[in-house]
């Protein structure tokens, strides 16, 4: 250790300080993420809207409520054939 000189003694507190700073920042980020997620879930449950409401679909239907899904049409690029008598 004596061959490392005085610079090694100065690096150790710096590395420990960097590790401590990393731990503090990680704890703040993790804590705020959990709190924000819990707040969003609580707000959705309390208001009765959102993905937690069984009467409201989590994903909107493409054609609107009660409308059939028409898709993107039939093109030769997709290799499909329109049904007899009309458009798909």
Curated annotation (Swiss-Prot):
Keywords tagged on the record: Membrane, Transmembrane, Transmembrane helix
Gene Ontology CC entries for this record: membrane
Transmembrane segments: 14-35
Residues on Extracellular side: 36-88
Cytoplasmic side: 1-13
Compartment annotation: Membrane
Membrane topology: Single-pass type II membrane protein
Coiled coil: none
Main location: membrane
Role: Associated with pathogen defense.
The protein, known as: Protein WIR1A
Source species of the chain: Triticum aestivum (Wheat)
């Amino acid at each position: 250790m004596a061959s490392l000189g005085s610079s090694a003694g100065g690096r150790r507190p710096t590395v420990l300080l960097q590790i401590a700073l990393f731990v503090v920042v990680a704890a703040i980020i993790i804590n705020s993420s959990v709190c924000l997620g819990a707040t969003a879930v609580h707000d959705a449950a309390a208001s009765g809207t959102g993905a937690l409401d069984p009467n409201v679909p989590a994903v909107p239907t493409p054609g609107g409520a009660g409308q059939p899904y028409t898709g993107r049409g039939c093109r030769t690029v997709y290799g499909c054939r329109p049904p007899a008598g009309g458009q798909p």
